[in-house]
């Protein structure tokens, strides 16, 4: 019985440590998203000057293909996130 209790405490420690790693990653992701959104807004201003369409299907396809190569194991999940990211970026560019 004692071994089971120690194992449970150890598992909790592992989960807590892993969550702390995720929290640190999230902090970085948030900072990078802020930068990405600022760049998207700047791109939108340049597109307005040139009277270009906000949506750039070729660029989005290029990014999705790059994701497929860089992260084949999580390609579907990352592609879903990027689909939403594209929508948000287009909103900032409009």
Feature annotation, model-predicted:
Residues 1-94:
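Domain-level signature for soluble enzymes in the chorismate/prephenate branch of the shikimate pathway
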């Amino acid at each position: 019985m004692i071994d089971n209790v120690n194992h449970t405490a150890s598992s909790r420690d592992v989960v807590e440590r892993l969550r702390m790693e995720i929290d640190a990653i999230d902090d970085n992701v948030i900072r990078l998203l802020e930068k990405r959104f600022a760049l998207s807004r700047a791109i939108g201003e340049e597109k307005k000057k040139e009277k270009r369409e906000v949506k750039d299907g070729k660029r989005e396809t290029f990014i999705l293909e790059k994701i497929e190569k860089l992260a084949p194991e999580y390609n579907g999940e990352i592609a879903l996130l990027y689909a939403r990211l594209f929508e948000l970026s287009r909103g900032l560019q409009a």
